[in-house]
């Protein structure tokens, strides 16, 4: 993970045109909100979307933006830069992300996306 960037993702590709992504994004005025989400893109020209049953599996919140399914992580909402640095340095944040990826992956590996 490149901590100098606002966003990082893991892509599962069937082919060049069909991709399912698990992503993490820091947002907010000072990038103090961390969100995780999933999205499915079936064409380079199409609007990213997530199948309804995928959204139901991962989150109870749906929006119409770039990440139709996402979750704010309460523990990491409005955290201070110093707290963020500590979570990164201790490895707690990367462990949380690894657990989240495993959680998502376990639920998508048998789905026909």
Regions found by a protein language model. Name each.
Residues 72-95, 102, 110-113:
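Accessory terminal regions of nucleic-acid processing enzymes
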Residues 1-83:
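Polyanion-binding interface signature
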Residues 1-11, 94-95, 99-113:
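Contiguous, amphipathic alpha-helical segments that mediate oligomerization or scaffolding
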Residues 49-53, 92, 103:
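Exposed alpha-helical structural elements
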